[in-house]
From Swiss-Prot:
GO CC field: mitochondrial inner membrane; mitochondrial matrix; mitochondrion
Molecular function (Gene Ontology), one example: protein-folding chaperone binding
Phylogenetic placement of the source organism: Eukaryota, Amoebozoa, Evosea, Eumycetozoa, Dictyostelia
Claim: Nucleotide-binding is one of the keywords in the record: yes
Protein name, as recorded: 60 kDa heat shock protein, mitochondrial
Chief location category: mitochondrion
Recorded family membership: Belongs to the chaperonin (HSP60) family.
Keyword vocabulary terms for this entry: ATP-binding, Chaperone, Mitochondrion, Nucleotide-binding, Transit peptide
Induction: By heat shock.
Record-linked Pfam families: Cpn60_TCP1
Keyword Ubl conjugation: no
Known function: Implicated in mitochondrial protein import and macromolecular assembly. May facilitate the correct folding of imported proteins. May also prevent misfolding and promote the refolding and proper assembly of unfolded polypeptides generated under stress conditions in the mitochondrial matrix.
Domain of life, source organism: Eukaryota
């Protein structure tokens, strides 16, 4: 009997209390998640396209932030109701994942998630099997990804790079040309960084430097909470070939750096135990220090440390070479004009290494390249050569106010990431047309059952949404635009929302990176499918703790 009651409560979505938790089931659970998804997507979708609107964000400190960046808007949204917030958090995860993978397309990923999940909820409410819907959605996504790869073509010119960057920067041709020039000067594999400028104009500077794929060992070293990175001007650099675990090894160098009022970056095989704890403790007390793992493994790690030492003018500290960490003096440390360290990478700008020594190192690597017969070794040598000899392009963002610089910096970062994605996987027609025309590949698909067919239809309908939203944001009826384009059946024909005309998107320079479109669809479908097949949610019950009463006043 008790089991029957429990089953009935589950079926009808009633509350079920356990210690400190609130549990909701079935349709009620999905409806609450959908509310969060729809509200977040509504705030994000207004930014899509060249005629998309700005969103103003309240910040706990400083001035409000104005942005057209979808992921920035999504990250600022938090709902008081924890049930509704669960859905919003999942979509924020989609936007963040999309931003991490390809740097753009976050708004597209968000509205695709909403479209698939909303229709999935309706289908489940109508009695369809959630797992069959999931199979149909996944099959359709695989088919569309294959279609995107078919129509994709490699990016081939500086002009096309400029076009991709311009579109991602909301039609700003100055930004597009700036990024194209940077890539032309340092190569498509080169390092480009974006920094705040000190003038009204945007500037591009090519400086000597290198980047390697290792970040800070602990998040306690972050000194820029907004950007989640550690950034030092004019630091000294300690390069150690070996592990550091004994705090006594570090005491002399920490005292030396503190007495000289210097910022310290330590690059070593690893820093652990008491040594790491001591660094974090001293960081909390005001010492400007950051610890970074050396890049690579084995012999490659050793030569990478030597490359870093040459760039920065440091001496590699190694007991094998007869130099102990306890005996380090200031002359053995390198330096740089600037170092930027995040969780995944480190960029050393304008190191103090001797120019002749750097050139000698470059020639040594080139000589090794001519002798090697191994493809793996050749790849590693080419990577090292690019890091040492290629330099770093720095885009300095100008503007009349902090708000303007911040908004433009977001757009430049988006444009830069989108351009890198285009170089990696090629381009497709933009303006939502690539996804729109991919619906034609789904029309004649035969599935195992009706529910799976509905799953395919859910994806097919969702693929219309990006193009429709771009048109709606431009003040045009999106349904009319979609009808006209589908009747044309020309994969390069689309609606130019900036000019309000129908034309060939490739010839007009309206193009999207294939990687951006592909990952937006995959991420959106993945999370939307999981939410559609969700049958219960568990949230913490928020307890309202009363304010402590004031003590009674004493009578004197």
């Amino acid at each position: 009997m008790f089991r029957q009651i429990a089953n009935k409560s589950t079926k009808f979505g009633l509350r079920n209390y356990s210690t400190g938790k609130d549990i909701k089931f079935g349709a009620e659970c999905r409806a609450l998640m959908l509310r969060g998804v729809e509200q977040l997507a509504a705030a994000v979708e207004v930014t899509l396209g060249p005629k998309g609107r700005n969103v103003i964000l309240d910040q706990p400190f400083g001035q409000p932030k104005i942005t057209k960046d979808g992921v920035t808007v999504a990250k600022h949204i938090e709902f008081a109701d924890r049930h509704i917030n669960l859905g919003a958090q999942l979509v924020k995860g989609v936007a963040s994942s999309q931003n991490d993978q390809s740097g753009d397309g976050t708004t597209t990923a968000t509205i695709l998630t909403r479209a698939i999940f909303a229709e999935g909820c309706k289908a489940v409410a109508a009695g369809m099997n959630p797992m069959d819907l999931w199979r149909g959605i996944n099959f359709a996504v695989e088919k569309v990804v294959g279609e995107l790869k078919t129509i994709s073509r490699p990016i081939s010119s500086t002009e096309e790079i400029s076009q991709v960057a311009t579109i991602s920067a909301n039609g700003d041709k100055v930004i597009g040309n700036l990024i194209a020039n940077a890539m032309e000067k340092i190569g498509k594999e080169g390092v480009i960084t974006v920094q705040d400028g000190k003038t009204l104009k945007d500037e591009l500077e090519i400086i000597e430097g290198m980047k390697f794929d290792q970040g800070f060992i602990s998040r306690y070293f972050i000194n820029d909470a907004k950007e989640q990175k550690c950034e030092f001007d004019d630091p000294v650099i300690l390069v150690v070939d070996g592990k550091i675990s004994n705090v006594q090894q570090l005491v002399p160098i920490l005292e030396l750096v503190h007495s000289k009022h210097k910022k310290l970056v330590i690059i070593a095989d690893n820093i652990e135990g008491d040594a790491l704890s001591a660094l974090i403790f001293n960081k909390m007390r005001g010492l400007q220090v950051c610890a970074v793992k050396a890049p690579g493994f084995g012999d490659l790690k050793r030569v990478n440390l030597q490359d870093i030492a040459v760039i920065s003018g440091a001496q590699v500290i190694s007991e094998e070479l007869g130099v102990r960490l306890e005996d380090v003096d200031i002359t053995m440390l390198g330096s740089a004009k600037k170092i930027t360290i995040d969780s995944d990478s480190t960029i050393i700008l304008d190191g103090a290494g001797d120019k002749a020594a750097i050139q000698e190192r470059v020639e040594l690597i080139r000589e090794s390249l001519t002798r090697t017969t191994s493809d793996y070794d050749k790849t590693q040598l080419e990577t090292r050569l690019a890091k040492i000899g290629g330099g770093v392009a720095v885009i300095r963002v100008g503007g009349a106010s902090e708000v303007e610089v911040g908004e433009k910096k977001d757009r430049i970062t988006d444009a830069l990431n989108a351009t890198k994605a285009a170089v990696e996987e090629g381009i497709v027609p933009g303006g939502g047309t690539a996804l729109l025309y991919s619906t034609l590949a789904l029309k004649k698909i035969k599935m195992d059952n009706f529910d799976q067919t509905i799953g395919v239809k859910i994806v097919r309908d969702a693929l219309l949404i990006p193009c429709k939203t771009i048109a709606n944001n431009a003040g045009v009826e999106g349904s009319v635009v979609i009808g006209r384009l589908l009747s044309k059946r020309d994969f390069e024909y689309g609606y130019n929302a900036q000019k309000g005309v129908y034309e060939n998107m490739i010839q007009a320079g309206i193009i999207d990176p294939t990687k951006v479109v592909r990952t937006a669809l995959i991420d959106a479908a993945s999370v939307a499918s999981l939410m559609t097949t969700t049958e219960a949610m568990v949230v913490e019950i928020k307890k309202d703790t009363p304010m402590p009463q004031m003590p009674p006043q004493m009578d004197y």
